[in-house]
Amino acid sequence: MSIKAEEISALIKQQIENYQSEIKVSDVGTVIQVGDGIARAHGLDNVMAGELVEFSNGVMGMAQNLEENNVGIIILGPYTEIREGDEVRRTGRIMEVPVGEQLIGRVVNSLGQPVDGLGPVETTKTRPIEGAAPGVMDRKSVHEPLQTGIKAIDALVPIGRGQRELIIGDRQTGKTSVAIDTILNQKDQDMVCIYVAIGQKESTVRNVVETLRKHGALDYTIVVTASASQPAPLLFLAPYAGVTMGEEFMYNGKHVLVIYDDLTKQASAYRELSLLLRRPPGREAYPGDVFYLHSRLLERAAKLSDAKGGGSLTALPFIETQAGDVSAYIPTNVISITDGQIFLQSDLFFSGVRPAINAGLSVSRVGGSAQIKAMKKVAGTLRLDLASYRELESFAQFGSDLDQATQAKLNRGARTVEILKQGLHKPLRVEKQVAVLYALTKGFLDDVPVSDITRFEDEYLTWLESNRKEVLESIRTTGGLPEAGLFESALEEFKKTFIASE
């Protein structure tokens, strides 16, 4: 076999012509300590705060503490395979999650990776999880109602699109049920819902997803989950991942509802990370910036101005209290950040008042501007009536010789409490709520026995649907009460057919 010099020289020339003298510079460090979801690395001198870094086994981390000699990294995945001396390299990217329509109907983790077994999420768009909240001039005051479908909330503590309303209460008082019912009521309301489960049992998250699927609510809902078995960094990041996914829709002129269930567990995870990163502890061993942890999250909820597209992001953060103590550190922090709170009380819950909303301690700082005109008219005095009933009720236990006015107040109050009770996963459209509350406030229920109130409500609404559909239709379309006398005549006609059980 003869070797041709021309062929060899031609090949060498071709290789020289195609030679690319690119030098890839990658910033590489060395792990000097690892454990409990935290790694310390030496040598990453140019790393950015919040930057993603990659360990030699492919697990990602996020740079948190930038110190003189080393970098504190929170590990976003299993850390047992990472060893002292392993390489860790910069990616040049800030922590980001996938966003877009393709996420709707999916269950994802804090990193936006699907965990529902339905294959990958087909989206190429991402957003950084830490983003600036809309400025003062980019916002508009909250004026559109967000109907939860829960009478006690829509009448007493109305929520508007773009508001932040805290739901606070002990464990097992129905906080998650309020969230699920609110999501179910957003059907056909052109609203994207995001349910963020932080530190929940996986069985609980499964039940929530199945409930949403059964009622057809998964068609407009994204579920972000960081279960109790996952490392603290993922629990800490879950709410930010949820709000980032929501912001993508908000900035495109859509309306979004984000539910954080619950932020107490996020604060605990952040405390754990901060102590492991050797940051100085403060009150209740929380780090000094635990207020900023929640404020920068909740400030990203907004009603955008028309110039910015008029989209909105409504936040419903949950806080779990211990023995009803709303004056603890985290509850007071979040109360001061939000635009009101709904307080769920275990005493009410166990006495059969469900949803167990304490009307005296619950407040909405947006108030009437987040209600339709009809609801404002029928629910105007409801709150005061309920408060005075609770006061009179405690006095009435001591004596029976009450004057007629007091007795009338007690009777009306008992019926009000009964009307505001509501079954699980049975949200009511606002026009039906108005119809029922009109009957209550105008005294049409005063002669109906308390034990029959729920039956009266169900039968009356069914009767209205069949015989006076135009009354409900006018409330739905105009937002105001129907013409004078229409409700009265309907109620009088229905009451003739209603048979009390006594």
Swiss-Prot record:
GO terms for cellular component: plasma membrane; proton-transporting ATP synthase complex. SUPFAM superfamilies: C-terminal domain of alpha and beta subunits of F1 ATP synthase, N-terminal domain of alpha and beta subunits of F1 ATP synthase, P-loop containing nucleoside triphosphate hydrolases. Gene3D superfamilies: 2.40.30.20, ATP synthase alpha/beta chain, C-terminal domain, P-loop containing nucleotide triphosphate hydrolases. It holds the Pfam family ATP-synt_ab. It catalyses: ATP + H2O + 4 H(+)(in) = ADP + phosphate + 5 H(+)(out). The record marks S362 as: Required for activity. It comes from the Bacteria. ATP binds at G169, D170, R171, Q172, T173, G174, K175, T176. Disulfide bonds: none annotated. F-type ATPases have 2 components, CF(1) - the catalytic core - and CF(0) - the membrane proton channel. CF(1) has five subunits: alpha(3), beta(3), gamma(1), delta(1), epsilon(1). CF(0) has three main subunits: a(1), b(2) and c(9-12). The alpha and beta chains form an alternating ring which encloses part of the gamma chain. CF(1) is attached to CF(0) by a central stalk formed by the gamma and epsilon chains, while a peripheral stalk is formed by the delta and b chains. This is ATP synthase subunit alpha.
